[in-house]
Amino acid sequence: MKRRNFLKLATTSTTTLAFSGVMSSILSGCSNPKLFKISLAEWSLHRTLQSGKINHLDFCKVAKNDFGLDAVEYVNSFFFDKAQDQSYLKEMKQRADDLGVKSLLIMCDNEGSLGDPDPIARTKAVENHYKWVDAAKFLGCHSIRVNAYLTESLHGTSTGNYNTIGSYENQINLAADGLRRLTEFGDTIGINTIVENHGGLSSNGQWLAAVMEKVDHPRVGTLPDFGNFRIQGEEWYDRYKGVEELMPYAKAVSAKSHDFDSQGNEINTDYYKMMNIVLDAGYSGYVGIEYEGSKLDEMAGIQATKDLLEKVKDSL
């Protein structure tokens, strides 16, 4: 039974005890009758923000007024020097609240490597993230998103060799150590620490799942990204396998998009297949639009991604 048909059945039939038994049977075979909600990741507008055409403080207004979205995911690089500026954070929060927009998380980059093999550098990286945990709490977010790749100098390159840092298992231990300490700090104020597949071994779903198991804390989790599965150079991990491996730990999901065909489908990712993986894992939270393409301008790319997600949702 399609999830949408399940919802109709659930809302129109309420009278008999026999039906409640039928519903229990259906529910056991339908992992997520609530489907999902859509949010906007600020990186979707990175060129527009970097050009100064819009200001970070107007991000929530764009999400709500231009796209009808009521939840956002911030990127720390767009207010990097404001993490401890209470007046600025207060203005961010007020603007979101006035618009009825939920602040979901802060994506954090350029604060050091949580899995750095140098213990002093690793500790420094952990502590560098504390201010973002505090900022997330102030803004009403549930999480900060961090990276589990081991050296930021290698992240995103085509030539960096992650195998020179240590064994596969050793890199699990290093990343888990930094993540565990940061997660324990966040736990003191109710903030999750979630990891995105974002290059290097973090784009290996099996490896990142092993890191989650090693940390073994209710406040640690993943942010599966549909597209970030390039490990290094031309070495890619299967995106569907990767998302499936990361979904058991997911506290957010990123719908990465680059380009679309004439039917409005993303050409790199089968959104129907991917969203079924997401929903079959029991996930019913926000799925964040993260448009990274160049053929469409950012506003059009965001709208195309939103339209596709809604089309997929209507088909389920």
Name each region found by the language model.
Residues 73-92, 151-154:
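Glycine-rich, proline-tolerant flexible connector loops at the mouths of alpha/beta enzymes
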Residues 33-55:
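Boundary/entry segment of secreted carbohydrate-active catalytic domains
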